[in-house]
Amino acid sequence: MSSSSSSSASSAAAAAFRPAVVQREQQVVEEKFPAAAAAMREMVLPPVAAAAADSEQEQLCYVHCHYCDTVLVVSVPSSSLFETVTVRCGHCSSLLTVNMRGLLLPTTAAAAPPPPPPPPPPPPPPAAHFPHSLNLAPANPPHHHSLLDEISTANSPTQLLLEQHGLGGLMASAASCRNNNSPAAAAAPPPPTSQGKAAAKEPSPRTNTAVINRPPEKRQRVPSAYNRFIKDEIQRIKAGNPDISHREAFSAAAKNWAHFPHIHFGLMPDHQGLKKTSLLPQDHQRKDGLLKEGLYAAAAAAAAAANMGVAPY
């Protein structure tokens, strides 16, 4: 019944747009050959059904063009609903890349019913109320004391016995050590005292030890008789001959010390058995005077050294 009504409606709709001659011929064919007319209608219906199926497989989507600020109505095939498609704007001819998955999922999420709210948390169990007679816990519990504190602070017969046997000081020292190791005692700095200031001013024992262990300072040594003789002899030779070099004067002074060993003992020179040697080859005129002056100066230096307590060589 429904198929005949739909076929008649479709034929009537098609006949409204056909010429009058074609409509008449179709009516004659339907009257004479009803079976052939029904077959022809069945052959025409499938394309219409296919078009309806295609229209059902497509979905209308709304795309916003960011170039011209226009909302576009786009028909997207069902095979491309979860892909990225390219849409051309009919207003500004711009190409838009649209992700259909992101475009359709918000509508699906909006259409879905909201999830039920989570159940509220269970209320906490009521606190047990005890009468005051059974409430054994104090409001402010005292700090836990060790056994040493109780023994040291309590005035008990045990404390008296310990003091009698000489162990009271041991317990007191243990209690003081425990108090010093507590966090409060470690955090609080010790109060400054006058004794502490005096101790800070005084040098530490370690510093005193370092001063004691320091090696003794070297005393300035007294120049030897040889050094004094050479120094005086060089000055005497340079005074007599200013043009002489220091090396030549030192060589002459060393020869005087080597050639006259008796002057080392502070003795006066003996001119009887002494061989005269020329000290300065370039000065032949004053060699006797230089020799005598050198001998007497060396003897005087040796005598002075002997008087000062210098041991002879």
From Swiss-Prot:
Alphabetized GO MF terms: zinc ion binding
Q: Which GO terms describe its cellular component?
A: nucleus
**Pfam families associated with the record:** YABBY (PF04690), YABBY_N (PF24868)
Q: What subcellular compartments does it reside in?
A: Nucleus
What are the boundaries of the C4-type zinc fingers? Answer: 65-92
Q: Which family does it belong to?
A: Belongs to the YABBY family.
* UniProt tissue specificity: Expressed in shoot apex and young inflorescences.
InterPro entries recorded for this chain? HMG_box_dom_sf (IPR036910), YABBY (IPR006780), YABBY_C (IPR056775), YABBY_N (IPR056776)
UniProt keywords (A-Z) are: Metal-binding, Nucleus, Zinc, Zinc-finger
The gene that this protein is the product of is: YAB3
Protein known as: Protein YABBY 3
Amino acid composition bias (Pro residues), ranges on this chain: 112-128
**Source organism superkingdom:** Eukaryota
Q: Where is this region: Disordered?
A: 107-149, 180-221
Q: Which SUPFAM superfamilies match?
A: HMG-box
Gene3D superfamilies recorded for this chain?
Answer: High mobility group box domain
A single BP term in Gene Ontology: regulation of leaf development
Q: Which PANTHER family match?
A: AXIAL REGULATOR YABBY 1, PROTEIN YABBY 6-RELATED
Q: Does this entry carry the keyword Zinc-finger?
A: yes
